[in-house]
Amino acid sequence: MAPAGLSLGATILCLLAWAGLAAGDRVYIHPFHLLVHSKSNCDQLEKPSVETPADPTLTPVPIQTKSSPVDEEALWEQLVRATEKLEAEDRLRASEVGLLLNFMGFHVYKTLSETWSVASGLVFSPVALFSTLTSFYTGALDPTASRLQAFLGVPGEGQGCTSRLDGRKVLSSLQTIQGLLVAPGGASSQARLLLSTVVGLFTAPGLHLKQPFVQGLSSFAPITLPRSLDLSTDPNLAAEKINRFMHSATGWNMGRPLAAASPDSTLLFNAYVHFQGKMKGFSLLPGLTEFWVDNTTSVPVPMLSGSGTFHYWSDNQNHLSMTRVPLSANGYLLLIQPHHTLDLRKVEALIFQHNFLTRMKNLSPRAIHLTVPQLTLKASYDLQDLLAQAKLPTLLGAEANLGKISDANLRVGKVLNSVLFELKADGEQAPESVPQPAGPEALEVTLNSPFLLAVLERSSGALHFLGRVSRPLSAE
């Protein structure tokens, strides 16, 4: 167990050891000057003032208080507006954040994939993970803030103000990254994507939260719901109340419900992400088709079918193929299929690494008739468990200094990320006979056995989702 006062340097060493990096492999290092505090901002922050007012606070209302239903169309419009007047520096900043969250995302995905069985499937959001950690960074004071910054991948070096992350810039860039994924490209663009994030802050009764922290979350989670309830008397009952409340507020069936937290917890941070992609030009095939979970077991699932010119690559050396399908003006769905079902684990370990985007350069356009399952993937994971596996169990533990979240001595319980990932056709049900495209003979690509997927935003290079599809309608 790492001591609470772990130095910044030791934290970085822990992170690098967990990531399995040798010094010569640090090709990902990048000048993150766009993400740290500017000199003028530092001068203002460091100017002594005896009249600095205390941060205003809010007291979360009881969990019985009703919340307006989540309006996902309004959230979509808000994300799109955030990208309408981007300057070059905003896009560069988003690219820097994309680099950081991809780096962290691949390592966390590896940890999750080793923990979850192949049969259970997996869907993971690097953006939600990075946003959650950045949120805690904005609420932290040293030494916790320095340790979180190192974990986010930006060593503070001299630890001066101008080497410290500006959490507001990072959260704003995360909003940009989300907006770029769903932004339309005009009348001829792809079908609309929905990407909605809701954060629930659940506190012990009477605990006060600082308003700047709560308001700052709106960049990546436009809807933040602070609620209070008894977390200690019956943790199982508290978990049931939270699950009912979030389902009532969002209408989303997130699958695996929140389990009971430790009875001494005073704050639970739960981020819920709903993604719905519609594949333009694809239709739902009549009836159900067998999806082979393994060589002897199949399940009937609805399938989507479409034809067009997609980017494709068959890697015979590593026994895999990759198909790239546009989802929006800036977003792509990447489908990675092992040539043999038993090779799924090997392909997963090979593909989901830091050279993932480099491999995409091998793709070339080709006429394809693509058949892919309709997807409803669900997953939940506790960031506290991931930190323990990273040998940083105290990072958000009892001794964490989270003085920008509350003046109370917080005890952070579960830090949950839950994902609901849906992939559908944008058209009606296809006729029994699907016409083939004119021109070159189309390659038949059918994903009717376990495969991998990724959702990429090309402008920032950020990976929004990574997944392993074992059961298209029940991966959780």
Swiss-Prot record:
Essential component of the renin-angiotensin system (RAS), a potent regulator of blood pressure, body fluid and electrolyte homeostasis. Residues 1-24 form the signal peptide. GO terms for cellular component: extracellular space. It is found in: Secreted. Glycans are attached at N295. Belongs to the serpin family. One of its GO terms (biological process) is regulation of apoptotic process. SMART domains: SERPIN (SM00093). This is Angiotensinogen. PANTHER family: ANGIOTENSINOGEN, SERINE PROTEASE INHIBITOR, SERPIN. InterPro entries: Angiotensinogen (IPR000227), Serpin_CS (IPR023795), Serpin_dom (IPR023796), Serpin_fam (IPR000215), Serpin_sf (IPR036186), Serpin_sf_1 (IPR042178), Serpin_sf_2 (IPR042185). Keywords: Disulfide bond, Glycoprotein, Secreted, Signal, Vasoactive, Vasoconstrictor. Residues 45-64 are annotated as: Disordered. In response to low blood pressure, the enzyme renin/REN cleaves angiotensinogen to produce angiotensin-1. Angiotensin-1 is a substrate of ACE (angiotensin converting enzyme) that removes a dipeptide to yield the physiologically active peptide angiotensin-2. Angiotensin-1 and angiotensin-2 can be further processed to generate angiotensin-3, angiotensin-4. Angiotensin 1-9 is cleaved from angiotensin-1 by ACE2 and can be further processed by ACE to produce angiotensin 1-7, angiotensin 1-5 and angiotensin 1-4. The disulfide bond is labile. Angiotensinogen is present in the circulation in a near 40:60 ratio with the oxidized disulfide-bonded form, which preferentially interacts with receptor-bound renin. One of its GO terms (molecular function) is serine-type endopeptidase inhibitor activity. The lineage of its organism: Eukaryota, Metazoa, Chordata, Craniata, Vertebrata. Disulfide bonds join C42-C161.
